[in-house]
């Protein structure tokens, strides 16, 4: 870390960091950055407030769109898996979205290590959203539980999993060395624990303090990333925290929003903007960038939700026109959540016989709704290509829908 760049930071301070690097075995005498407690709201330029307003408007439209969805659980599944794939990719864990969507059909032994790690994020986010619905607030204990779920079964699943870290960590750089790192967060110990407690208290006072929710989410994400309180999973948890805070503050009522695809496509600027806050106190540049990301993400999510609902309506119209009801109709309705199916999976999910499920799948194939992907006679694999395209493909750039 370039200590000279952060030496005069107006939002934090450098502290000594000495020890022996456990990865390289080399002693180091370096510094780490400890952020100050968050301000209530930093002064922002007019252009930044306009970006914040546009983000708030887009979030409001997503909120309204979610309220109009008759079965939101069907949409939570694909949108969360899309977010899981993208937020993991930002951290160097890659699994094709098609595999993430079809993972329930695979034997666990057939899943790659990367795919298992992406699915950990799905479980982690599901738990977090469920806890908020139960009325739990964000606490250090909750964050520790979430981190433990996130790293379960991975190399980071050590005795330290689920605990605030007790070792130094380094972010980026040419090697694993702390000295070569792009950024070195706060060292372990009382200051890190106090900083995390201050952040949690700030999150839970945000609504009462009358802070703008978009600005608050930007500040919280910066602070969490800068503290880096865990040995692993900080980036993914930090992006999950954006959605958790918007839900806790009542800006959103459903967890459909995915923020990572936008940040993933701008990874270098994302990292640079965070660093510029620590080095120069550039809240304005970070919050404007963040607000642009929230606006684009909310707009994209809402447009994909509408695209999925359009696909569902088209499927149901085809089924009605063919005079089909029962299990085939129910299957057509559920494809926006489960775009990859096998006959066995349909039978298990519906509680019907294998033959009934097979007949339903065959009828949807005849209608062009499902397509067989394997070319086999046993363990045939089917896909709803229109649903996959709505999740993966380009989406209209128009703002009004």
Residue ranges: model-predicted function:
Residues 1-401:
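FIC/Doc superfamily catalytic core
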């Amino acid at each position: 870390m370039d200590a000279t760049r952060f030496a005069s930071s107006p939002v934090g301070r450098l502290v000594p960091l000495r020890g022996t690097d456990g990865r390289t075995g080399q002693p180091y005498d370096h510094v780490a950055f400890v952020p100050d407690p968050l301000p209530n709201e930093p002064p922002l330029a007019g252009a930044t407030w306009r970006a914040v307003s546009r983000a708030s408007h887009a979030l409001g439209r997503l909120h309204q769109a979610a309220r109009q969805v008759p079965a939101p659980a069907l949409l939570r599944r694909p949108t969360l898996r899309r977010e899981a794939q993208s937020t993991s990719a930002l951290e160097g864990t890659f699994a094709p979205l098609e595999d993430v969507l079809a993972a329930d059909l695979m034997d666990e032994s057939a899943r790659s290590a990367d795919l298992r790690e992406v699915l950990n994020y799905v479980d982690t986010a599901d738990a977090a959203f469920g806890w908020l619905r139960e009325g739990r607030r964000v606490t250090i204990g909750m964050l520790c539980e979430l981190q433990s779920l996130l790293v379960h079964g991975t190399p980071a699943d050590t005795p330290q999993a689920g605990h605030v870290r007790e070792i130094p960590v380094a972010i980026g750089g040419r090697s694993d060395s702390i000295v070569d790192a792009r950024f070195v967060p706060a060292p372990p110990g009382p200051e890190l624990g106090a900083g995390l407690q201050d952040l949690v208290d700030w999150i839970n006072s945000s609504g009462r303090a009358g802070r703008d929710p978009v600005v608050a989410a930007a500040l919280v994400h910066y602070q969490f990333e800068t503290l880096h309180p865990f040995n692993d999973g900080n980036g993914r948890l930090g992006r999950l925290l954006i959605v958790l805070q918007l839900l806790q503050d009542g800006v959103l009522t459903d967890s459909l929003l995915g923020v990572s695809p936008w940040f993933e496509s701008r990874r270098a600027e994302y990292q640079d903007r965070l660093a510029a806050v620590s080095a120069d106190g550039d809240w304005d540049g970070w919050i404007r960038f963040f607000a642009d990301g929230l606006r684009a993400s909310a707009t994209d999510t809402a447009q994909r939700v509408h695209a999925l609902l359009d696909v569902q309506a088209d499927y149901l119209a085809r089924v009605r026109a063919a005079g089909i009801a029962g299990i085939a109709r129910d299957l057509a309705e559920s494809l926006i959540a489960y775009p990859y199916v096998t006959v066995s999976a349909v039978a298990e999910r519906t509680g019907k016989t294998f033959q009934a499920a097979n007949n339903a799948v065959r009828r949807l194939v005849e209608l062009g709704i499902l397509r067989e992907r394997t070319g086999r006679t046993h363990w045939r694999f089917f896909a709803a290509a229109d649903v996959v395209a709505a999740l993966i493909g380009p989406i209209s750039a128009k703002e009004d829908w």
